[in-house]
Amino acid sequence: MAKVLLLNGPNLNLLGSREPEIYGSTTLKEIEEKVAAVLSVHEIECKTFQSNSEGELIDWLHTQRGADFLLLNPGALAHTSVGLRDAVIGVEITFIEIHLSNVHKREEFRHHSYFSDIAIGALAGLGVKGYLLAAEFAVDYIEQKGNINSSI
């Protein structure tokens, strides 16, 4: 069975209550359930993890080598973490970077990501729909064995 990872970084455990005008009112658990539902239709396993600790995110990712795809919302670590970037490169799992808010319409320091240039794609500003679109893309990617141009 194919496996997709859903990895969420710092403060995303507060979704639903933290700045809902920016991040919406959907909780992380609800997002995880929605993503898992998209994947399960295609008999793809969804493994989820969230931590506020960069080291825990890296350690968990190291244990997931061999997964078929990664959905990554690094949160604020997108703008600061060379360590998590190196871990993503090291495990050699194709991934999409996801942000609930449009980071390019926010503070200047949020405009740079250490992940965008190594991701197969990036989604920002689409709220929960961004996660679902990323999950749908992961399904297509897995079904095409990485040959995404055949479905375009």
Q: What are the residue ranges of the model-derived segments?
A:
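N-terminal small/polar loop signature for handling phosphorylated ligands or for N-terminal nucleophile
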Residues: 52-91
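Short, glycine-/small-residue-rich phosphate/pyrophosphate-handling segment
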Residues: 48, 105-152
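Short, acidic/small-residue loops that bind anionic groups at enzyme active sites
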Residues: 90-106
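Short beta-strand elements in bilobed, periplasmic/extracellular small-molecule ligand-binding domains
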Residues: 32, 36-49
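Glycine- and acidic-residue-enriched helix-capping/strand-helix junction motifs
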Residues: 15-29
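Extreme N-terminal starter segment of soluble prokaryotic enzymes
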Residues: 1-4
